Amino acid sequence: MTYTKYLLFSILVVCPSVLSAQGITRRIHQIDEVTVWGKRPMKEIGVQKTKFDSLALKENIALSMADILTFNSSVFVKSYGRATLSTVAFRGTSPSHTQVTWNGMRINNPMLGMTDFSTIPSYFIDNASLLHGTSSVNETGGGLGGLVKLGTTPTVAEGFNAQYVQGIGSFRTFDEFARFTYGSERWHISTRAVYSSSPNDYKYTNHDKKINIYDEDKNIIGQYHPKERNRSGAFKDLHLLQEVYYNTRKGDKLGLNAWYINSNRELPMLTTDYGDATDFENRQREQTFRSVLSWDHIKSNWKLGVKGGYIHTWMAYDYKREVAPDNWASMTRSRSKVNTFYGQAEGEYSPTKRWFFTANVSAHQHLVRSEDKNIILQDGGKAIVGYDKGRVELSGSVSAKWQPIDRLGMSVVLREEMYGSEWAPLIPAFFIDGIISPKGNVMLKASVSRNYRFPTLNDLYFLPGGNPNLRNEHGFSYDAGVSFEVGKENVYKLSGGVNWFDSYIDDWIIWLPTTKGFFSPRNVKKVHAYGIEVKANLAVQPAKDWLIDLNGSYSWTPSINEGEKMSPADQSVGKQLPYVPEHSASLTGRLSWRSWAFLYKWAFYSERFTMSSNDYTLTGHLPEYFM
């Protein structure tokens, strides 16, 4: 009876939101006329960019950004399911080669160099785009694969507005969404909240185990796959986002963004674990606070912006075992604290409609302490597990963009980076694009850049396994592509593109097992990552209020170790790097009528290897799969 009331209450709450959204949905479904790319923003000259529209971001507010990227882009999203670690990699690189920014501030974990996209609800993101390969140099350094750019917008409806949505899913999964906004001529204020929880307890057939069937003489006469329960996958995630924007109406804009995360997640046991799940506790907790304070001064042909930010992250991992009834022994009590201070200043100037100049400088100061409270931290003055380090990271760039004619554009970017006390060599990038046929908006793009990436703090200092002698990753990347867009207003729209990329990276960092029983990072002398990216979109409006929308993408991403053998027994040279799929694809189909929609999603990743030798062994090979 309680669940029935709960469901009815949810339907009553959701229905007004759905009904009020019908007009908005109809406007979204309208197919606009095709624009002429000669009027493209000069900031995007030569840039390989994938932008997600509001329909993709808000089609299901219960999704995380990991889900959005999986089914709407060509990047590789490695995920273990909802409320579990989800990372993103471009073009045959690793997740630590992907830079992520939120409202301009880089949010990669300085310990790991990567970002967990399962902790980013799409409900909190208003703008999202991907900058592929060399295009990331326009925004930041270190993105050997690319950049995921996330942000929020200050636009809210006038007056006071409130929204509440509740979702109910399988295995007693509940999602709560709330937003309160106030808008006036000068003030835009928004408060958003998301709370998701589930015991995530369900039955399944474990195909990774076999149970023997014996006769009376203890002879094996058969086998079967047991039915088990996922008893250690519960999660509770709370997100709060506060935004305040003020427009002086005299060219100045002030903004404050503050985002709080409180996550409590159990980590499921391996499907090959024959232990009793009730005898173990495997739990990860996280509390993160991110804030950005911004000021922008905007005039007709120039802009000046200043930002300051702060990130605090506390993470805990606990592994306990019940050694006797009601007697639990703590095996691991890992604790990490990260404090990051951020500052940035940028300027834009356009003296004429043919020229556009930018300058940018940013700083991140990281303070990290990592330890296991179950282990003595010092042995004769030397740490056994964990570390306590700080590092400052500086990045600056200048760019000049020139459009001699409407159909041709060129851009030069110069970037400089410093990590700790070490400066990177100058990072140059050149971009060019041109419209070769106004009919069909056929555009060619090409770019070349140098890129440079410093090791993460874990790469250098993590114990056991860190390698303080690691060299920095560096190399050159080349891009070329063609895109088109044709259509007829309110009838159909077809767009697509093909991009080729080629990267030669020296001293590539990869974590590999050692004979000492733990993993350790090392440099691979040379890696050649190359391939193609294909994307296409078709929207057809067969009748009034109807829309058929198809989005597809495909990536071919060989990432080959072309270095020298580390030993006579080394079989990794000439092989695909571990954990990197060579092929990936996604497809999303939508059939819409007014505010109703039927969706189909499909994603595919080819086989991956967990060993650098690419051996087809039980533990060294992951078969291809699709969702």
Positions of predicted regions on the chain:
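Short, acidic, small-residue-rich periplasmic hinge/interaction motif at the N-terminus
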Residues: 22-58, 95
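N-terminal periplasmic accessory domains that precede
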Residues: 65-68, 86-89, 101, 115-121, ...
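Short acidic/polar hinge/loop motifs at secondary-structure boundaries
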Residues: 105-133, 464
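Membrane-embedded beta-barrel scaffold of Gram-negative outer-membrane proteins
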Residues: 301-319, 437, 443-445, 472-530, ...
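Gram-negative outer-membrane beta-barrel transporters
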Residues: 403-407, 500-504, 523-613
